[in-house]
């Protein structure tokens, strides 16, 4: 039972770190969200993104 709980905690921690690395700010300057769509598509494979504080954020 102790090993199962340790494995579960390790799985949660790894999942959180993978999700936070996969999405986020990329080094592309922008003034409108449409400028981020192509850049996000190239970086993450998904065209979902928005301009936030003059920097693209991909989802």
From Swiss-Prot:
Residues under site feature: Aromatic residue of the functional dyad: 59
SUPFAM superfamilies for the chain: Scorpion toxin-like
Localization in the cell: Secreted
Cross-referenced Gene3D superfamilies: Knottin, scorpion toxin-like
Gene Ontology CC terms: extracellular region
Expressed in which tissues: Expressed by the venom gland.
GO molecular function: ion channel inhibitor activity; potassium channel regulator activity; toxin activity
Keyword Transmembrane helix: no
Annotated site, Basic residue of the functional dyad, chain positions: 50
Keywords: Disulfide bond, Ion channel impairing toxin, Potassium channel impairing toxin, Secreted, Signal, Toxin, Voltage-gated potassium channel impairing toxin
Domain of life the protein comes from: Eukaryota
Record-annotated disulphide pairs: 30-51, 36-56, 40-58
Entry annotated with the keyword Signal: yes
Family statement: Belongs to the short scorpion toxin superfamily. Potassium channel inhibitor family. Alpha-KTx 16 subfamily.
Other comment: Negative results: has no effect on rat Kv1.2/KCNA2 channel.
Function: May play a role in blocking voltage-gated potassium channels Kv1.2/KCNA2, and Kv1.3/KCNA3. Blocks the voltage-gated potassium channel Kv1.3/KCNA3, with an IC(50) of 118.3 +-55.8 nM.
Domain notes: Has the structural arrangement of an alpha-helix connected to antiparallel beta-sheets by disulfide bonds (CS-alpha/beta).
Protein name: Potassium channel toxin alpha-KTx 16.7
UniProt organism field: Mesobuthus gibbosus (Mediterranean checkered scorpion)
């Amino acid at each position: 039972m102790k090993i199962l709980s340790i494995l579960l905690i390790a799985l949660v921690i790894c999942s959180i770190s993978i999700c936070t690395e996969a999405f986020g700010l990329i080094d592309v300057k922008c003034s409108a969200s449409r400028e981020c769509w192509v850049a996000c598509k190239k970086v993450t494979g998904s065209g979902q993104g928005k301009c936030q504080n003059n920097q693209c954020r991909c989802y």
